[in-house]
Regions:
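Short, flexible loop segments at the rims of nucleotide/cofactor-binding pockets, characterized by
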Residues: 49-52, 73-74, 122-126, 155-156
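Short, hinge-like loop/turn segments at secondary-structure boundaries
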Residues: 76, 113-115, 195-198
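Conserved H-X4-D acyltransferase segment
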Residues: 6-13, 42-98
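Short, basic, glycine/proline-bearing loop/turn elements
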Residues: 46, 118-122, 152
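Membrane-embedded segments
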Residues: 80-134
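A transmembrane-helix-recognition feature enriched in membrane-embedded lipid enzymes
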Residues: 1-59, 110-115
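Non-catalytic C-terminal accessory region of glycerolipid acyltransferases
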Residues: 4, 129-242
């Protein structure tokens, strides 16, 4: 029954919401080059997708974040629905780091660029480092938070080792890095599936880690700490409840 609902109800409405909100966002970008209006529309899009998919999101730990602060957010990534959940329930103006190849896709590439999202070139270590340096400069200059999936993509099982880009950007920009964990989304929409199951997921926020005084030589240790923190945030929900 839930598969038929997903196929005949949720997926068509997701496609419709994406077309409508994407068009509105692109039009809004003609008048607002800051990306703020596009982000507000993306938040509405995220909530719409979760609603038609019958996915509820419970947040924990948002009080740990300064509403006026700038952060580098890092999160685990297990499902396509992670992005709508983060847009809908993380109450910050933030931008994503997105694969450079996405910017070559008609309509999508122009929208990402106008919304202020940052392309990542992974063709070589030098190109990747240049992307990270440019991203750090944008964070420091604009005071806009960014969000990265340091696993480098969706993980079909467990938590993969983190790449150091988030730690590099946070240290270079001199802003705190905040670990996030999304628990339960893999069960509702696993990789390779179009069967969206109804249910609840948890978006849990860890303690922000300050980077003031850290040099780039400390990015490996910061990266290891971020991995441990996200792992622990996930373990809180995986542990048996007494």
């Amino acid at each position: 029954m839930s598969f038929l609902r997903s196929l005949l109800f949720s997926i068509p409405l997701i496609a419709l919401a994406t077309i409508v909100m994407g068009t509105l966002s692109l039009l809004a970008s003609l008048a607002d080059r800051t990306g703020r209006t596009q982000h507000q529309l993306a938040r509405f899009w995220g909530r719409a997708l979760l609603a038609v998919s019958f996915i509820r999101v419970r947040t924990e730990g948002l009080e740990k974040l300064d509403p006026r602060g700038t952060y580098v957010f890092v999160a685990n990534h297990a499902s396509y629905m992670d992005i709508p959940a983060l847009l809908a329930y993380l109450p910050f103006q933030f931008r994503f780091f997105a694969k450079k190849g996405l910017y070559r896709i008609p309509f999508l590439g122009g929208h990402l660029r106008r919304a202020g999202h940052i392309p990542v070139d992974r063709s070589s270590p030098r190109a990747s480092l240049k992307s990270m340096s440019e991203g750090a400069h944008i964070v420091a200059r604009r005071g806009t938070s960014v969000l990265l999936f340091p696993e480098g993509g969706r993980s079909p099982k467990g938590l993969r080792q983190f790449k150091e880009g988030a730690a590099y950007i946070a240290i270079k920009a001199g802003v705190p890095v905040a670990p996030l964990a999304i628990f339960g989304m893999r069960r509702l929409l696993p990789m390779g599936s179009i069967h969206i199951r109804p249910g609840e997921v948890v978006l849990r926020v860890g303690d922000p880690i300050p980077t003031a005084g850290l040099g780039l030589s400390g990015r490996a240790e910061l990266n290891r700490r971020l991995f441990r923190d996200v792992e622990q945030l996930l373990d809180v929900h995986m542990a048996p409840q007494g």
